[in-house]
Amino acid sequence: MKTPSLTGPVFFTTPKFARLRFAFKLSFAIVLSLFLGFHLQLETPRWSVLTAAIVAAGPAFAAGGEPFSGAIRHRGMLRVVGTFIGCIGALIIIIATVRAPVVMLMLCCIWAGLCTWVSSLVKVENAYVFGLAGYTTLIIIVSTQGTPLLTPQFAVERCSEIVLGIVCAILADLLFSPRSIKQDVDRSMGELLVDQYRLLQLSMSGAEKETIDAAWHALVRKTTALSGMRSSLMLESSRWQNSNRRLTSLHTQSLTMITQACETYLVLQDAPTPVKSSLKLVLDQPVESFRDVHCRVKALRHLIAADSRDVPPTLVSWVGAATRYLLLAKGVQTNGRITTIEADVLNSEVEIKAPSAETHHAMINGLRTGVATALGCLFWLSTGWTSGSVCMVMIAVVTSLAMRLPNPQMMAKDFLFGTIYALPLGALMFMFIMPSTQQSMLLLCLSLGAMAFFLGLEVQKRRLGSLGALASTINILVLDNPMTFHISQFLDSAIGQIIGCFLALMVILLIRDNTKAHTGRTLLNRFVYGAVSALTTNTTRRKENHLPALYQQLFLLLNRFPDDIAKYRLALWLIIMHQRLRTLDIPQNAALSAFHRQIRATAEQVILARRDTTRSRYFTQLLGELERYQQMLTEQQLPASVTAPVGRLTGILRDYQHALSN
């Protein structure tokens, strides 16, 4: 078998070339920021070099490879915003407490904890802004402890150096032709639809419960991943606006198909009914591609249109959602203008955003950052160590950035190992290589670029300590103007980094996050609220699309409780009940409308209750109200198709009352 040559067209499309391209991109960004920093006579070009390295390498470490187009630009813009917020916060704190340095440092620790708390509540994409704002304030205040009157000048210099580093990272990203995510979006849409059809086949054939669980579990993750790709596509270019709108609705259609397929399975399990031979003939045919599914959905649509008797309503709904999916997927592939039919689909529902269910988790994160920085501050003040400020800054950086991740301990370990690796690597650069390049700017750039190139390759492999080593090595190198080489200062800074990361890891380990059970219960009660909120006669409320918010909470549940299949099933049943109750033909009636509002208010009290006894009391009240509501529907002489789903929901809540209320 012939291997592709380095000059052949095949090599330029391989993952190996993408890794090499990113390593060159990272080296170019660092070298350019270093050269411009010295050329523009900046006081500390190290900050521009460090910024370029973090902005370029951070998304690559998160992605496990070269980031998609737009990711580095987005990261850079977030860093600009976070830096300005941090500078403003530092100026306000210094002006208010300039005569009380200890109070100033304590306020700075509280500010860092507050920013971490906010970053844990906002979207993951925007959390970087607030984490950065917290430790930027700390850096400025710590760096100007001896000369507070120079704070405005220092803040302006830091902002200038950071903006220069961001500009260099963005220029490098543009010059080295970042890869577009569009092809991955098109491929993922096709694979997702094929998997959706296979889940329907499993549901109609009465497969094992474990097989169904594994299938819909994987589909939820793939649908969430496609939604994340949509965000990356918008970062790439504004020309994808129409595709973005289609992908938003396509996300809803995918979730609808998962729900309808699982409901079909439950319906057939409760009341097994033979499937029409014509439908069975189509459903039994295997599918391998997007085109195969298109043909099967078209055949199912024709069969249902010809004779819809004995066809499960959930199957009809699934085919309708699949038809809309196919329509939108074609529009995404072409990125053409939105047609009238597509506009009707896009405007048919109003998506509802879900509030954060991790408020207690966010408080723990803020407490960790505040306590860790306060301990670092006390350590610095009590010892008088010259590099105590470096230790304190590293504590703030690690705790601020690690808290938003699913595994903060692993992030802290990455920084700790990185600072340990940075000691010998930095010593090699500082003691031998950099002093030999003092007469040549070219040699200095080449040496730093070579180091960045090899570390860039390791960062893409998500090697433990690689990202921390890159940032820590640059941080302890004296890239100032003019450059000085003091061994004691270098060792103090290197050891200060290690101690700071170690203290941050100890705080994360000692202040345990015991909010997991609370978050899980809150999420499950949000599903209960989502189910009962579907009971309404208000046409505006009926158009509200809660499905993306409910599945977003389900995805969070999957991440927080990766092995608790019982929680997943309960959550999925409640989502199915939401969809079923949403389609009920409830007549306009003032008494029923008032009861709907009362049920929603009680369900909200279940979520807000802080004590188990209070929550249990409101939950019992909710069950009583649902039973009374079912009686009211019966008194209205409504058919069983309306009253039975309410009874089914009441039965589910009664069976799981202990898990939902205690």
Curated annotation (Swiss-Prot):
Segments crossing the lipid bilayer: 22-42, 52-72, 76-96, 102-122, 129-149, 161-181, 378-398, 415-435, 439-459, 467-487, 491-511
Membrane disposition: Multi-pass membrane protein
GO molecular function: transmembrane transporter activity
Any Pfam family hit: FUSC
Major localization class: membrane
Superkingdom classification of source: Bacteria
Protein name as annotated: p-hydroxybenzoic acid efflux pump subunit AaeB
Chain's role: Forms an efflux pump with AaeA. Could function as a metabolic relief valve, allowing to eliminate certain compounds when they accumulate to high levels in the cell.
PANTHER family: MULTIDRUG RESISTANCE PROTEIN MDTO, P-HYDROXYBENZOIC ACID EFFLUX PUMP SUBUNIT-RELATED
Family, as annotated: Belongs to the aromatic acid exporter ArAE (TC 2.A.85) family.
Matching HAMAP family: AaeB
Subcellular location: Cell inner membrane
InterPro entries documented for this protein: PHBA_efflux_AaeB/fusaric-R (IPR006726), PHBA_efflux_pump_AaeB (IPR023706)
Organism, as annotated: Pectobacterium carotovorum subsp. carotovorum (strain PC1)
GO cellular component terms listed in the entry, alphabetical order: plasma membrane
A GO BP annotation: carboxylic acid transport
Keywords tagged on the record: Cell inner membrane, Cell membrane, Membrane, Transmembrane, Transmembrane helix, Transport
